[in-house]
């Protein structure tokens, strides 16, 4: 016997609020509009976004990157800090494609949750739009997925996707790096978006509170400082010093020890000098509170260097000056040497 349902069901009864999704799109559209740039043919609201590659490129090569924010999001949930993780999301992808010498053109995001909070999602997307403005790329589309039962209330996950372009003849691949080249480092804003599982473990061990004073700032402000976006500054240096910049490394998961080798040919090593830059107070505190060994620090965290630039020694001072004029804090942190037998491709001495 077939039983009749007591009342008709709706999608909202199942946990999906279409009206909330529409309200979020209305909140997002003006945020995305601020990021528009030449080349955008169709953006938010369509089935697909359209972008025309700028005509200035003779042989354009498209460069893509995707990433998330990792467990830094857990602190965003616990501390109710949702306005900066969107900047982190953009930074992780645009800095990655910058490493190939690419200019970021457009960005898409994916926001997944169990129950959609329009205010929370709008705060996150506001950060994404701010990151896109800093990178000079258009927030051209995205996806908001409300999936009941998949995530606890108040939690969400993020993924970002960046596409850029570089002239084929100007691709940075590190193949010209040789012994004697100079290693420059650009300052980070903090832990950026990596190592936060260890950060959270140390915070728990230390009994730290988000509102406690940390050298004149609330600890939460320091820990949640958004990842720096290096795009415009580095692109300016690349344009001003053709051939002088030989390689870039975005210091993300794996720290200095695992990321710099990604741009080095076999037989080369980067020798970095720990006294060449000041490790920020956050990392000093994390190391002390967690009893973390030096090698582990350099393998997990950026330790104050968010982007590494390998340059021809003859142009090192000029490149550093250009970056400083763009507002970067630049340190000469090491040099490229011939790799010794049994030696790692990056050593901190």
UniProtKB/Swiss-Prot annotation:
Entries under InterPro entries matching the protein: PurM-like_C_dom (IPR010918), PurM-like_C_sf (IPR036676), PurM-like_N (IPR016188), PurM-like_N_sf (IPR036921), PurM_cligase (IPR004733)
Enzyme class: ligase
Pathway annotation from the record: Purine metabolism; IMP biosynthesis via de novo pathway; 5-amino-1-(5-phospho-D-ribosyl)imidazole from N(2)-formyl-N(1)-(5-phospho-D-ribosyl)glycinamide: step 2/2
Transmembrane segments: none
Substrates-to-products reaction catalysed: 2-formamido-N(1)-(5-O-phospho-beta-D-ribosyl)acetamidine + ATP = 5-amino-1-(5-phospho-beta-D-ribosyl)imidazole + ADP + phosphate + H(+)
GO BP: 'de novo' IMP biosynthetic process; adenine biosynthetic process
GO-annotated molecular function: ATP binding; phosphoribosylamine-glycine ligase activity; phosphoribosylformylglycinamidine cyclo-ligase activity
Pfam families per record: AIRS, AIRS_C
EC code(s) of this entry: 6.3.3.1
Signal as UniProt keyword: no
Keywords carried by this UniProt record: ATP-binding, Cytoplasm, Ligase, Nucleotide-binding, Purine biosynthesis
Coiled coil: none
One GO cellular component term noted in the UniProt record for this chain: cytosol
UniProt subcellular location: Cytoplasm
Major location category of this protein: cytoplasm
NCBIfam families, alphabetized: purM
Family according to the record: Belongs to the AIR synthase family.
Protein name as catalogued: Phosphoribosylformylglycinamidine cyclo-ligase
Native organism: Bordetella petrii (strain ATCC BAA-461 / DSM 12804 / CCUG 43448)
């Amino acid at each position: 016997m077939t039983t009749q349902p007591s009342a008709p069901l709706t999608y909202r009864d199942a946990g999906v609020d279409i009206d909330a999704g529409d309200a979020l799109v209305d909140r997002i559209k003006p945020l995305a509009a601020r990021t528009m740039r030449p080349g955008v043919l169709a953006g938010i609201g369509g089935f697909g976004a359209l972008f025309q590659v700028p005509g200035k490129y003779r042989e354009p090569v498209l460069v893509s990157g995707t990433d998330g924010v990792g467990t830094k999001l857990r602190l965003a949930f616990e501390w109710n800090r949702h306005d900066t993780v969107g900047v982190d999301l953009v930074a992780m992808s645009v800095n990655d494609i910058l490493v190939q010498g690419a200019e970021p053109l457009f960005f898409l995001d994916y926001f997944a949750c169990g129950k959609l909070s329009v205010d929370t999602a709008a705060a996150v997307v506001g950060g994404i739009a701010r990151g896109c403005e800093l990178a000079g790329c258009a927030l051209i589309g995205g996806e908001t997925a409300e999936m009941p039962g998949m995530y606890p209330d108040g939690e969400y996950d993020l993924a970002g996707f960046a596409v850029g372009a570089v002239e084929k003849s100007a691709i940075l691949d590190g193949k010209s790096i040789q012994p004697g080249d100079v290693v420059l480092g650009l300052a980070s804003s903090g832990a950026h978006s990596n190592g936060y599982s260890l950060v959270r473990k140390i915070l728990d061990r230390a009994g730290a509170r988000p509102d406690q004073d940390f050298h004149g700032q609330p600890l939460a402000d320091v820990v949640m400082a958004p990842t720096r976006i290096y795009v415009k500054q580095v692109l300016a240096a690349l344009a001003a010093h053709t051939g002088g910049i030989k390689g870039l490394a975005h210091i993300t998961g794996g720290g200095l020890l695992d990321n710099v080798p990604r741009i080095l040919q076999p037989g080369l090593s980067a020798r970095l000098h720990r006294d060449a830059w000041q490790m920020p107070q956050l990392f000093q505190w994390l190391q002390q509170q967690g009893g973390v060994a030096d090698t582990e620090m350099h393998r997990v965290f950026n330790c104050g260097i968010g982007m590494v630039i390998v340059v021809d020694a003859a142009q090192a001072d000029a490149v550093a000056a250009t970056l400083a004029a763009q507002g970067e804090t630049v340190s000469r942190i090491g040099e490229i040497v011939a790799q010794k037998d049994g030696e790692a491709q990056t050593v901190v001495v």
